[in-house]
Amino acid sequence: MSPTRIYVDADACPVKDEIYKVAARHGLPVSVVAGNFIRVPADPSIERIAAGPGMDAADDWIAERAGPGDIVVTSDVPLASRCVKRGAEVLAPNGKPFSEASIGMTLAVRNLMTDLRSAGEVTGGPRGFSPRDRSAFLSALDTAIRRIQRSNKTA
């Protein structure tokens, strides 16, 4: 198994700075993936990936590489589903983990809300990102890293 890597679906990710700090503390490499150029700290453990044009280019890049022992940070539910199926730990920026048990219902709700929005039945979007979300994310990321490290020691 290759070393744990954190993959960040970077477009509109509000916790990139937190990811960089936690990854540095644990000595983990980070791949920051976006459709276009995105600014990242000058750190050899942080890899910037401009996946190129296309709505799903960044998602495809991450989904093709993430696997068991890796962590993916995304708010994109279809990407989360693909990565969970490949065995990666997946977290939303608010700290909510996506799992085999929860991803089916999460996808169904996402698709329902998309249909309701397109029919004009629902307006608006999710609530804003809060300090509580940031704190929950930091806790969830630390927990995921520790869980992977424990399983690597017993493997």
Swiss-Prot record:
Matching Pfam families: DUF188
Xref: InterPro entries: UPF0178 (IPR003791)
Disulphide-bridged cysteine pairs: none
Protein family membership: Belongs to the UPF0178 family.
Protein name: UPF0178 protein RPC_3085
